[in-house]
């Protein structure tokens, strides 16, 4: 309710004082750095696969997957570009099933003990309309396959720099102080 109220207040600010705004409602954001909350499960699953740990994504079904860099670009552009009006956009990225996401994960980690169980997420998994990208001048979000590959590359680069991903994974799960 607070988010909807904020969107409506933004419309009033535009109507009464000419203050422009963009509200962005992202779907499941995944990729390096996305490690908190239930919706971080796809990223945690990829990290688990990278460190050869088992993991279960706690939801199934259709999901809109938004790569973290694509989300960041949109938020930065929304805050830094000039426009008129009070806009609200869903940011759905690439609609896919969790099963499809797991298949892409297993392309990179064939022996990974990663699975999914549970109810579907209660959000629509629809394609982006393109209206946000048109307003702020960005290309479409990257395909899920590319985002998964970029996440794998990011984790491998972190390991090559000496980041202890196994420890980071355990910390993400709350298993280390």
Model-derived segments and their meaning:
Residues 8-63, 70:
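NAD(P)-dependent short-chain dehydrogenase/reductase
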Residues 2:
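Active-site helix of classical SDR
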Residues 5:
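Active-site His/Glu-centered metal-binding helix of metallohydrolases
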Residues 58-61, 65-177:
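C-terminal substrate-binding subdomain of Rossmann-fold SDR/epimerase-dehydratase oxidoreductases
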């Amino acid at each position: 309710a607070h988010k909807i109220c904020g969107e409506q207040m933004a419309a009033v600010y535009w109507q009464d004082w000419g203050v422009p705004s963009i509200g962005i409602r992202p779907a499941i954001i995944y990729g390096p750095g996305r490690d908190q909350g239930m919706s971080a499960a796809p990223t945690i699953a990829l990290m688990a696969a990278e460190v050869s740990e088992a993991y279960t994504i706690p939801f199934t079904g259709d999901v809109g997957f938004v790569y973290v860099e694509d989300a960041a670009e949109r938020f930065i552009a929304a805050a830094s570009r000039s426009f008129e009006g009070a806009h609200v956009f869903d940011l759905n990225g690439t609609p896919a099933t969790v099963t499809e996401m797991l298949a892409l994960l297993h392309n990179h980690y064939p022996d990974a003990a990663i699975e999914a169980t549970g109810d579907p997420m209660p959000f629509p998994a629809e394609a982006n309309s393109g209206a946000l990208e048109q307003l702020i001048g960005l290309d479409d979000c990257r395909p899920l396959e590319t985002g998964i590959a970029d996440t794998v590359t990011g984790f491998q680069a972190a390991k090559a720099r000496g980041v202890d991903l196994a420890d980071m994974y355990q910390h993400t799960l709350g298993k280390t102080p």
